[in-house]
Amino acid sequence: QEVEDLMPHRLLHNIDVVYIGDFPRELEDRNALYSNGGIYMTANEPTNFDMLENFVHEVAHSLESKYGMFIYTENLISEFKGKRERLGALLGARGYEISPHLYGFTEYNEKFDNFLANEVGYPTLLSLTMGLFVSPYGATSIQEYFANGFEKYYLENPRTVRDISPVLYRKIEEIINDDEA
């Protein structure tokens, strides 16, 4: 019921089923995944809010099939890359080194993800990305930038997304207000 109060039902059009349980093959090392009309979520989250965060995040990924060409335009890519460049400068100033061209990739890159998660670590990343990304995970790839912003828009404060990522905010607003959705 809580999800239906949060967002328009039409945004759930690509979701046929939600599975909650133990899915080591599907999830690998993730907490949740959207795939082929289904959302797979681990049952091992500590709180209901964590489950809700996972669900809303995966709803965002489900919207990519319909809205991908609209979402991932040059202006959003430019906003994301600019933030990545600033993150690179912040990390470099603190002695964290990785190939500079990895900051320019918009798609998921396992080497870059491992660098952020394991070498830098999310506690450090959290302090460095405040005001730059709505959360550290949004720095992972442009798809996570979108899904993370969507999640924060619905579960925290849309104004935070607007203030930190104005292009992303406008994309989310336009999807929400799309009568064709």
Feature locations, PLM:
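Charged mid-protein connector segments
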Residues: 33-41, 53-54, 58-62
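Auxiliary, metal-adjacent structural segments of Zn-dependent hydrolase domains
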Residues: 1-37, 44-48, 72-73, 90-103
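Catalytic Zn2+-binding segment of zinc metalloproteases
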Residues: 52, 58-77
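Pan-zinc metallopeptidase signature
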Residues: 109-181
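Zinc-dependent metalloendopeptidases
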Residues: 33-34, 39, 66, 79, ...
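Alpha-helical hydrophobic/aromatic positions enriched in membrane-embedded helices and signal peptides
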Residues: 49-50, 136
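Low-complexity, serine/threonine/proline-enriched polar segments
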Residues: 80-117
